[in-house]
């Protein structure tokens, strides 16, 4: 089974690629390398014994996304991590976040819904809960107004996916996790951004 992991050389994406390959899936990783490095591919290979197929694609380029899905029309599922992710940066540069986190998502959804098997996992965020009314937060907690443009892009993304799933053959799930941190136990992959690390233990 062939699985596409967008943002596949990022922090969460690279760990997911490792787990998928260890389970026997054929993995294609897409990344535009805006906040990651090709060195991650070597780390994945040292852990699993195999490099994933890698495509250097910016998902904001619609034609590139269309070309990719024509090339790999036998994909069984997509795990979508590709996104800008820093809350503070999103406040300073909201248009970058709306372009990268929303446009790219729409372009991927437009193509995956054309496939025979449309399975989609979305990397959302605990930020969709906003200023939570009840603690601790559970999966049943209500979504509150976003506290940042980043959080808003995740809320909008969830709404888009929900709407698309209602009228297509796409199966989808939304992952709202809290502050994933730390390196792989092998220390071969971890938080290796080009800028300031966001996923380190204080």
Model-identified regions with their sequence ranges:
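Conserved NAD(P)H cofactor-binding loop of Rossmann-fold oxidoreductase domains
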Residues: 82-85, 124-125
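A short helix-coil junction within the Rossmann-fold of NAD(P)-dependent oxidoreductases
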Residues: 85-89, 111-119
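N-terminal Rossmann-like NAD(P) cofactor-binding module of classical short-chain dehydrogenase/reductase
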Residues: 76-79, 121
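N-terminal Rossmann/SDR dinucleotide-binding element
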Residues: 1-77
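Short beta->alpha connector loops of Rossmann-like oxidoreductase domains
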Residues: 37, 85-87, 129-130
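Rossmann-fold NAD(P)-dependent oxidoreductase module
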Residues: 15, 19, 111, 160
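Catalytic helix-loop patch of NAD(P)-dependent Rossmann-fold dehydrogenases
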Residues: 92-107, 119, 128-174, 179-181, ...
């Amino acid at each position: 089974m062939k699985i596409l992991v967008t943002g596949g050389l990022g922090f969460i994406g690279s760990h997911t690629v490792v787990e998928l390959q260890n389970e026997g899936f054929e993995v294609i990783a897409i990344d535009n390398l805006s906040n990651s490095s090709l060195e991650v591919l070597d780390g994945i290979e040292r852990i699993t014994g195999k490099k994933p197929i890698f495509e250097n694609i910016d998902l904001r380029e619609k034609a590139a996304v269309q070309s990719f899905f024509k090339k790999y029309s036998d994909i069984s599922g997509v795990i979508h991590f590709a996104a800008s992710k820093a809350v503070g940066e999103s406040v300073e540069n909201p248009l970058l976040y709306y372009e990268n986190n929303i446009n790219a998502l729409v372009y991927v959804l437009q193509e995956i819904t054309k496939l025979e098997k449309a399975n989609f996992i979305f990397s959302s965020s605990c930020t969709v809960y906003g200023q939570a009314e009840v603690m601790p937060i559970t999966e049943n907690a209500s979504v509150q107004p976003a506290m940042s443009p980043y959080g808003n892009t995740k809320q909008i993304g969830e709404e888009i996916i929900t709407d698309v799933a209602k009228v297509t053959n796409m199966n989808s799930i939304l992952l709202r996790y809290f502050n994933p941190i730390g390196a792989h136990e092998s220390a071969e992959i971890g938080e290796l951004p080009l800028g300031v690390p966001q996923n380190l233990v204080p």
